[in-house]
Amino acid sequence: MKIKTLETFCNQYVGFVRATAEDGATGWGQVSPYNADITCQVFHRQVARYALGTDADAIETLVATIPEREHKFPGSYLMRALCGLDTALWDMRGKRKGKSVCELLGGKPRPFPVYASSMKRGEITPEAEAARFIKLRDQCGYTAFKFRVGKECGHDEDEWPGRTDAIVPQVRKALGPTARLLVDGNSGYTPKKAIAVGRMLEDHGVCHFEEPCPYWEYRWTKEVADALSLDVTGGEQDCDLALWRFAIDMRAVDVMQPDVCYLGGIARTLQVARWAKDAGLPITPHSANLSLVTVFTLHLMGAIENAGPYVEFSIEGDDYYPWQDGLFTPALVAMDGKVPIPAGPGWGVEINPDWLAKAAYQKSELA
């Protein structure tokens, strides 16, 4: 059945996509968060025009063809927009078949382990970070926690002098020896400094060092990964499949972290997961907010063979992400350190009509 209309509902931060087929079947997806209003313009200009009138179930063909048709415009915005089409069509496919996307991919909806992911760095002291981790452990059953070290794109600087050396032992002492600790460097270090920080992390039993070097410096990151025994991880920023192949072939990191929305949707992320599986590498995607990206990631991780042990689950509320409240129902909630993969058809969630009523609207349709 052919795609008849493609609609977007957006604000600056979030953009939902509704795809409707000629028989009235619908599916909901989402472009990547942040500057979503710009991404929705790209969607209508450079994505929708190629999708209208094509087979709504030909997801893999569409997401492979559109970047070729727009080959003069490679890069992040096109992939962020493409995700809106891909994910809307996966939702439609699931609803047609009466299955969740997880089931379409060969998995089974179930509670999936998550790690408590802090987005704060300069806004919080080491003591306060450790205290909220303890509270979340006791309330939600988390056994794994991620926090920030260094300074974002920091050229070896710390967010403030001594912060990294303080927060790592502080969190370890607070949570005890059995908690799994993960840290994110956010492109902060040169290899020499990253290795030195990594040695300190190893001394405190940290198991995951994310994006230690500028993400575009693959050889720098590989140098760090080769030098350390803990897992060096990365890949969230990468939206080019050729770069993914390059990073996997050179084993730039120990754990691959694609972001479903940045990369262009489920079909492209599945390709990365297959390449990683063939290389013996696990996948632990980037899903750093509670928009639909975490829903997409839960479904994916419930199905792929090389899924890592956890899905990233943001612990930030309205003080940090005021825009993520009330987007869809049911809301994602962590209990016993797990979040259920939504079990209904498609993504298993409903977009909030009150949110849609306030959003900027645009429609592309068959002539």
What kind of region is each of these model predictions?
Residues M1-W28, S32, D318-D325:
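Structured beta-strand/loop patches that form or line metal/cofactor-binding pockets in enzymes
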Residues R45, T61, R199, G205, ...:
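Shared catalytic-loop signature of beta/alpha-barrel
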Residues G317, Y321-A367:
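C-terminal extensions of enzymes
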Residues P111-F112, A116-L228:
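Metal-dependent enolase-superfamily TIM-barrel catalytic cores that perform enediolate-based chemistry
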Residues T20-K97:
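Metal- or metallocofactor-binding catalytic centers and their adjacent structured scaffolds
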Residues N11-V14, Q30-D37, H71, S117-R121, ...:
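Glycine-rich phosphate/pyrophosphate-binding beta-alpha loops
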Residues G29, V114-S117, T143-F147, L181-G185, ...:
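Hydrophobic faces of well-ordered beta-strands that scaffold small-molecule active sites
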Residues I3, G24, V47, L85, ...:
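Conserved, mostly hydrophobic/aromatic
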